[in-house]
Every structure is written in C-alpha cells, then in structure tokens.
Amino acid sequence: MYLADLHIHSKYSRATGRDADIPHLDLWARRKGITLVGTGDFTHPAWREELAQTLEPAEEGLYRIKKEARLADVCELAVSPRFVLSGEISCIYKQDGKVRKVHNVILLPSLDAAERLAFKLETIGNIRSDGRPILGLSSKDLLAITLGVCPDAVFIPAHIWTPHFSMFGAFSGFNSVEECFGDLAPHIHALETGLSSDPLMNRRVEMLDRYTMVSNSDAHSPAKLGRESNLIDAPLSYPALKKALETGEGFAGTLEFFPEEGKYHLDGHRNCHLCLTPQQTEQYGGRCPVCGKKITVGVLHRLEQLAQRPEEYVPAGAKPFEHLMPLPEVIAASLGVSAAGNRAERLYIKLLSQLGPEAQILRETPLSDVERAGGSRIAEGIRRLRAGRVIKSAGFDGEYGKISLFTPEELKNAGGQLSFLGEIAVAEAEPAALSPENAAPAAQTEAAPGKTDSGRRANAAQWAAAESKARVTAVIAGPGTGKTFTLTERIARLVEKGVKPEEICAVTFTVRAAEEMRERLRARVKRADKITVGTFHSICYGLLRGEVSLAERSLQLKLAAEVIAEYGLKCAPRRFLGDVSAYKNGKGETSEGIAEYCRRLRAAGAADFDDLIALALEKKNKTFGWLHVDEFQDVNAKQYELVMQWAGERGKLFVIGDPDQSIYSFRGAVGDCFQRLLCDRPDAEVIRLTESYRFTPQVLGCALQAIGANGGERALVPVKAPGAAVRLAECPSGMSEGIFVAKEIARMVGGLDMFGRGREEKLHTFGEIAVLARTHRMLRVVEDCLRKEGIPCLSASDGAFLEAPEVSGTLAFFGALAGGGESAQAETFLGGREAFDRAKEKFTPLLRARPRKILAQWGEYMHINSAAYQQLSDAAHYADLPEFLEAMRMGGDGDVLLPGGNTSAGAVRLATLHGAKGLEFPVVFLCGANKKLLPPETADEAEERRLFYVGITRAQDELIITTSGEPSPFLAEIEGTVKRENAHPKPQYRQLSLF
C-alpha cells in the first residue's frame, strides 16, 4: 500500500513557490512519505521540458527522478517517489444561461501523451502563461478532446465543492455530473473532494456513491504536499492506478484535512470579518448584514443543498479515512510557536531523521518513540490528533480555518497536567447587534430587461421595409435597429410569396455576415441554399468560376518582389500590393511598377482579389430579379456600378445600411451611396428604422452625442432598460491601459483563480467581452497583458500571418485538394511531387471533416506549431473546408480573426475598430482614445468620428473607454455621457504612529 498525491502545481503556476521543481518535489515527497506524486502543469511547455530532463521512466506510465538531479536529505523511503503526468485546467464558459467556472484534473500515461494533448489545447487557447491554463472551453468539450487524444487519460473534476471554481460550486456549478458532462458523464469515475469537505460530508450526497472520492493536496509549494492524499493498495503502475480510480478496486481510502481548516468550509464575508453557518446565511437572505453584498456560500452550505442523507450516514462499502494535520503544524500547535519558525523547523527535521517520514510519524509511530525524540508535549499533540480531539475554528470566504490541539490556558501552563479535550463544536459567528430587521439593506437587483420579440415579429418600420413593393427601396438602419433581421425577413417573405430562390441575391460586406445570413435563411425557408448569398467578391468569383484563376497570396508576393527589385522601388511587397489594391479600387494612382505587376499577373493566367469586380462588370447580361445589398454605405464606385448592372432595368433593388457607419474610404468606399442612389433613382422609397434593440440608453446616448458633431438629425430610440453608466478610465500609459483592462476582465468573470475571485452580481464569460482599438499596435499591448494574466483571447492581426510560409503552403495544399487546382505551390512547400502525393493520399479522406479538425491533424503531420499557424487554426471556424478556404481568400480582417459566436472556446475578442464592424458584445473596452491616435493627424475627422461611433455601438450593455496621455478630442464631445475614473489613483499618505 502506498500514498498518492495526484493534484499539485509547479513553479509555472501562479502563486507557487520557486522551489516547486522536480528535485524539491522529490525531496518533500520523501519527507511526507508519499510514494506517487502528480507532476502538475503538464500543459506548460517549459515544465514539460524540465520533466523530460529530470525524470526517467520507471514502472509502466510512471517516472522517477534521475540520480544526478536528486537532493540528499535526512529522510528516505523504501521506494523512491514516482511521478505521474498530471495537470489542472480551468474552464470558464457559459452553459444553460449561466457562467460556469470548473477546474478539472487530468492524469496521463506518458510525456508523449502530454505533448499531444498540449498541442491540441494550444490550438484552442493560451497554455503558456500559466501552469494551470484558463480555457473558454466547456468541461464536456475538454473531456472529449482529452479522450480523443489519449483514451487512457483519467479525468477528475477538481475540488468539486469550492464556491467559485468547481463542478458543484455555489456560484458557478451544476447540480449533477450529468448536467455538467451530458452524454459523456459515464467517462467520469472519480471526483476530488477538496480541502473543505471530507468523506463524512460527501456520504450525505447519494449520487456520489458511484464515484471514487479522491483527496489531493492541490499543493502550490513542495512543503504543502500530502495535506490530503490517497491510499492505494495496488501495484505501482499507471494501469493499476487508473483501475483503482475508475473501479475502486485497490483504492483503500484517504488521508484528510479537517474540513473546517479549509478556507471555504462555512459561509461568510471576509471583508466584514463575518463567519456564518448555512442557517444564518438563509436567515439574512444570502446578503451580508454588515455591507449588504452577497455572502460567499461555503462548502457545507452547498453540500447541504444537494444532500439527501443525515449527518454521520455511512453507506455500505464506504472507504475508510483519517483526519491529519501536517507535522509542522502539530509541532507548532503543541508548543505554541510558529509552524514556519526556526524552532519548529529544527524539531521537524529531528523527528524525520530519527523516526522516518511524516505520514508514518502521524499515523503509526509509537507515542513513546515520539516522546523520546520530540518531547511529551508533541507526543500528546499527536495522541489528540489521532483521537480526533481537536479544537476547530472554521474557515470561510477564502480564509483558512484553524485547528488547535491545546487551549490557550494549557499552552500558558506548559508545566501543568495535560488533559484530553472533549470535541469542541464550531462556534456560531453571531453578528453583533444585527438582525434581518436592522441589517443593511440587500443590494437592489434590477428587473431583467424584457426580451424584445424582434427575432419573431417585426416592428412597423421593419414590416414596411420587408413588405415594400417599390422597384427601389433604400432603408436607413441605425445600429441595433434589426438590419439583418429586416433583410432576412424580406427575403423569406419573397420566397413564401412564390419568388424563386434562384432569382434572389443578397450581397453582404463580409464573409461572416454572409454565413450568418445563410444560417438565418436555412432556418426560415425551404431551398435556402438556392439563394445567392455572399460578398461582392465571392459572388463575382462564383460567376467567373472556370473563367478565371484566382492568384494565391504567395504568387502575388513573388510577383511584387520581382517588380520591386526590377524597378528599384523602396517598399515591402505587402505595401506594394496595398498600393495596387488602392489603384484598382479607385483610390490611388497607377505607376510603371503597378502596370508591370498587372501585366505579369495576366501573363501567369491569374487574377487577384480586386480584379474580380472589373471582370464581373464585363458580364453585361447578368442580372438578378431581386437584389439586396447590405452595408450599402460602404460600397465603392465600381461596386455601385455593379449593383446597378445586376439590378438591371426590371429587377427590384433593396439596399440597407447606415451612412453614419461609412468607414472604409481607404478601400474606395465613396460614402455618399445613398445620395447617389436617390439621384439616380428618384422613385426610390426611403424607410428609416429608429427603434434600437441593442443598447442600453446610456450607451446609445453616448453614441448619439459622439456622432452629433458630424451634423444631421438622428432619431434612434432605445428599447432596452437602463443599464450601467459609460465609464471613461484615465490611465498613466498605454501599458497601464492594458493592465487595467486585464484586471477589469478578471473582475467581470468573477476572478480567474481562488486568490483573486471577484464578487460581481452579474458574471460574464470571456466570449461576451471585446477589446477594440484604432490600431493593431494598441491591441498588441492589451493582448500581452491579457496573456500574462492567463485570459484567453482571440488576437487581432493585420493579416500578416496569412503570408507565413507554413500558412500559405497549407492553404495552397488544401486548395489544390479541395478544388483540384494548381498544385505547384503546394509541391514546393512540401518538398516535391512525391511528398505531395503522400500527403494527398492521407488527407483526401478527411476533406469532409471540420476545418479545425483537419488543421489539427495537418499540424501534427507537418510538425507545425507556430504562432501564425495557431492564428490560422483560430480562424478555422467554418462548417466545411471549401467555405473556410474561400473565407481566407475573400474575407476581411474581421472574417479571418473574429469567428463570431461559432467557436466552442470562449475568448475575449480583440479587434481594430474597422475589423469590429458588424459585431456586438455585452461588454466592450474601447482603448487608446488618445490625441493623434483617434483620430490620426492626417485622417479625415468626420470619418474618424464615424469610426469612433462604430466602436461605441459595438457595446450592448457596458462600455468602458480608456485613455492615456493627452485625450482624444472626441472625448470632449461625449462629456456628460460618461463617468470618469482614475484607473490608478494616487496613494494616500498618512503619518505613521511611532507605536
């Protein structure tokens, strides 16, 4: 029989000791008497590298320290400690309308399995900044991924009762294993009890009978090993351990903390020094009687909510357990000294050297031997511990409880006779002179805003637009007024009235918007796939399919580099291609270099992205009977010409958009499309949508004041109930803006760990939060801060990752496979035709799989794990490979990097103000509202103000604007609609007392 502590952390986790490495873990395992130790943190690449360097294989699936890494010590075991690969992952996500924060422990049989699982998880989120990574992934999805990579893995929900971060936790947990894991619940065989509960408590919950209830230390430093551990009566091997945990055969019981010593045993509010029993919490309505804030509901209270059995119930076949205290604490409690002091440490080492490891001393060593080595007081302390005769002061709200072995009087009277103490009940913490009648009033909770029925019933203006019979209809739709709904409803009603789907076309501004439109139409009408839906470029490419070959990005860069070299131009290929695009969109001038590039592109038999519009204009006979154009304010001159051509003389044209959101002049957008249309088609019917469903009145008021300086009247009316004030945080620097945002996000999700959890009335998931900025540079500052804080995020980019060789080569390979196109670039990337054929044979059967799955397997096959490839994987949220490849060719900034709501992993979204167009989030941080940055000095002020307006109107409920240095002039224009705050208040100085 041996002791196993399977849940610990390394020095790569937050709030851990610097000595949490293998040599010190091995040393302390010997001192504690633990034979099997989890490595912890297997997801962290630096830790895995250390494990590979300091460990060597032992029994099947287990490792031991290499001799050269071993530290000498006073205490030895008959068998040197073994290590098993383990790690803890924090899952923060939304399920069933509630934010869930669940920690899970995973055991693996090898370093290779750890490497493979870590690789898979790195395509989902950031696993490098913390040994216990935070993923916006459900526990069920994490379990599925784990078993998919390693079927022999053991998956254990961690410290299941902890209030803020566990499967059954009071604030974010579930009521059953099935509720958490769904149809994968049968794969859960063991649950971890946590320090604040013990088997006696857990036996009261009948549904736990079928699980192996394990106990581990969750140690953040080697000296904390073995606070709780498991007794295993089975051979030393991973298969035997797995069997013991999954079947209970060979699982002999646990060594336990006194649950009262755990820091979440009782209820309470630490800031008000208030500890409550579950009954008292109910008496006060769950609110602190001192300050009125929510009380942290402890483990005992939560367990009682799910318990069906009385206290002291012992089911048949229950495993034995023992309550223990760490030996240094026993020494300190017996002598009245500090457990971390020199005297306690000297006695501890002396006892180990003379009597053996700690677990043996506490459980088995004759008390006479203890008395000879350490004195009568320590022997008596151990006697009382073994008998369970201890004094308990329970922990609450993150504050550890205290277990005493002697009364203060006994400690003072060191020479007096020692007597056994009766069990002392937990003292109830009665709030002084407070009762429910005179307690502070509970915080008032607002009634939830009534759900609008805009998803099912149109308002009067929306209905008028959907039913319009005019040959040309122009709809002015401000933000949040149901633009996409109105457009979808109109198309659906046309089909219901007998219009053939093949005669209908809907042009969107982004691939993502086209995807959303298709999904809505599929849910609304039959034969929706027959309706033409796409961006200008994707529709043009479809019309020209078979007539034109679209140049891969690598070919464009190659031709650009050749022209730059030949003409001695002083610019990078990427910048040159930007100039070419501007020229083709009517925003730039031609040059000899640009003309030569276009000639070479034609000679290669290819066209680029911007050629598609011009080529489509040559097909004069192509028209649509019912043409719909979304985001009409953003079309450029050639696209406008194409709209008029596609509508023809007999077709019906329906355009919708918001002139206040015209922000793409740099791409050729003319900005006056609505005015031009009304001049060209004076018979057009103009309809205005004015009821805004997206924002609170506070956000909408700020937005209207921001855009007001551009002139004109706007009649937007908020439908939502009032919400939080718009905040303006003034920071000392750009870096402090990033730090402020990271800390605020951590607060909004209720804290990232048990050291910094928040006390929010309403919690958000990471996926409900966005960070927007004018430039990628500002976003990179914020991103660094988020990643250092361990917050998962989808990073913004200027698209440069698409030019990385491993990315362009990957897209070329799958483009050749999926479309049967030219394979020359892919062959070059793979190193020849033979390598291409091998890869083709392996991946052709996978072409129908989801793009994320394909890219994950391709990354393993090609050993690709670069940041650029990870960005490609982040963007692979499409339903099938052709759609994904088209998006990579056609998509804008937001399409590639912000996959909307389709990702299974929740992450904070980072986007430029341009890239965020069309998105909306419950919470938005708008960063870098500084002079010369928003707006830039050379920019058109009116368009930059529209861009600021777009940023503000991405926020549904909460908007936080940050600034540093000299503020943007736009901030003066919204004065009165924002609540200012100093993100770094100056320290308050006071005279220190001499005493």
Residue ranges, per PLM feature:
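C-terminal functional module detector
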Residues: Y2, L27, P45, E56, ...
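Extended substrate/RNA-proximal surfaces in nucleic-acid metabolism proteins
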Residues: S13, A20, R48-H189, F420
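P-loop NTPase Walker
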Residues: E446-E547, G648, G701, T953
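Accessory N-terminal region flanking or inserted into the helicase ATPase core
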Residues: K451-E467, R471-V475, T481, F485-T486, ...
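Helicase P-loop NTPase motor core
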Residues: A474-I491, P682-E685, S692-I791, A818
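Conserved helicase motor core of SF1/SF2 NTP-dependent helicases
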Residues: T481-T484, K622, W626-V629, Q633-A709, ...
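Conserved P-loop NTPase-based nucleic-acid remodeling module centered on helicase motor cores
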Residues: E503-G578, S591-E592, A604, K743, ...
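Conserved helicase C-terminal RecA-like lobe
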Residues: E783-C785, A804, L811-E981
